C-alpha cells in the first residue's frame, strides 16, 4: 500500500513534463489509495512543473517504502 512520504515512479507518461519513469514523493493520499498528490522531481532533485500533480494509483509504482 502506497502511503504519504513513499517514493514512487510513474509507469506511464502523465503529461508533457512528467514522463514514464519519473520519480516523486507522495504528499497526500485520496479516495482510500486510488489517487495521490505527488511532488515530482527531476534527476537533479528539482521540482518538475507546478510542483504537484494528482495521479491515479494505476499510473505509479512504489519505489521506496518509507518506514514510519
Where do the model's predicted regions map?
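Long, low-complexity intrinsically disordered regions
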Residues: 63-68
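Basic/aromatic-rich interaction segments and small domains that mediate binding to polyanionic partners
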Residues: 3-62
